[in-house]
Structures are given as structure tokens and as C-alpha cells.
């Protein structure tokens, strides 16, 4: 990925994050990494935050209004407890540029809980007998809602 990459030529990214109880270190590290990497390739990025709004829906609506009132072309919602890679963000932008029908993209990430039933199944199947730390791969639980 270089500064002249056509996927980024007309892109102005807004990263929108509702923050209620503070941002996790992994989010802060990822956001700083994204800001630095975007600057290096000439991609304008703007970060917007809504602080201490107890309604996540209201916070996201407020951030959406900020996006619509801005000159940004791409909106990325990232919660303040999520780790992400700038490369994944750049890949999403490239896909959206290459495929205009992909105007809205999303990424799934696990809920903040351990799915003990999956962990127990993994133990029963012997999936982590060589390295018990591998059980972490089976602990996630996802909730996806499609409209």
C-alpha cells in the first residue's frame, strides 16, 4: 500500500467511537497506529468521540450526524474496547472502492464473555491437549443480527 494507491485518492475517513467508561489500551494503540499509518500514506483520518452517553444507540446516532455534517467519505465505528489492525481498515476501504455495491461493510467480533460450553466441548474433543492455551480460540461467542 502506497500513498498513490487509487483506493485512497478520494477517501476521507472518520473513525467514530462512543466511550462511556474510558478506552482500553488495545483500542488506543490501534487508533494511534491507524493515525500514523494513514498519515504515512496520505489518507486523511479524523477521530470523533462521544463521551459518557449511557445509550449506545444515541451515541452512535450522534456520531453519524457528525459524519453527515463533515466532509468525510467513509465512516468506521469502532468501540473503545476493541483491538483492530490498520491493515484491516485499509482492506475494507480497498474493497469498497473496488466494489461499489459494498457501500456498507461490517466486522464481527466476540461478545465480552466466555462461552464455557464451547470451551468444554473443545476439552472433550481434545482440541487443546497439546497446549491448554489453545482453549482461548474456542471461548468466543458472537451475536449477529441481520436486518
Regions found by a protein language model. Give the residues of each.
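N-proximal low-complexity "stem/linker" segments adjacent to membrane-targeting elements
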Residues: 1-54
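Residue-level marker for beta-strand->alpha-helix junctions and adjacent short loops that shape enzyme
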Residues: 20-22, 82, 110-112
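Alpha-helical elements of Rossmann-like donor-binding domains used by nucleotide-donor carbohydrate transfer enzymes
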Residues: 30-33, 62, 91
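Active-site nucleotide-sugar/metal-binding loop of Leloir-type enzymes
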Residues: 61-74
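Conserved catalytic core of nucleotide-sugar-dependent glycosyltransferases
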Residues: 85-147
Amino acid at each position: 500500500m502506497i500513498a498513490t494507491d487509487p483506493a485512497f485518492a478520494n477517501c476521507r475517513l472518520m473513525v467514530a467511537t462512543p466511550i462511556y467508561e474510558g478506552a482500553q489500551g488495545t483500542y488506543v494503540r490501534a487508533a494511534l497506529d491507524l493515525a500514523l499509518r494513514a498519515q504515512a500514506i496520505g489518507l486523511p483520518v479524523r477521530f470523533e468521540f462521544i463521551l459518557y452517553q449511557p445509550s449506545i444507540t444515541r451515541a452512535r446516532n450522534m456520531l453519524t450526524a457528525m459524519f453527515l455534517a463533515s466532509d468525510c467519505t467513509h465512516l468506521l465505528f469502532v468501540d473503545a474496547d476493541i483491538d483492530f489492525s490498520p491493515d484491516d481498515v485499509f482492506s475494507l476501504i480497498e474493497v469498497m472502492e473496488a466494489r461499489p455495491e459494498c457501500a456498507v461493510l461490517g466486522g464481527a467480533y466476540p461478545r465480552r464473555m466466555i462461552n464455557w460450553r464451547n470451551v468444554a466441548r473443545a476439552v472433550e474433543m481434545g482440541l487443546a491437549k497439546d497446549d491448554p492455551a489453545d482453549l482461548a480460540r474456542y471461548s468466543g461467542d458472537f451475536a449477529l443480527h441481520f436486518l
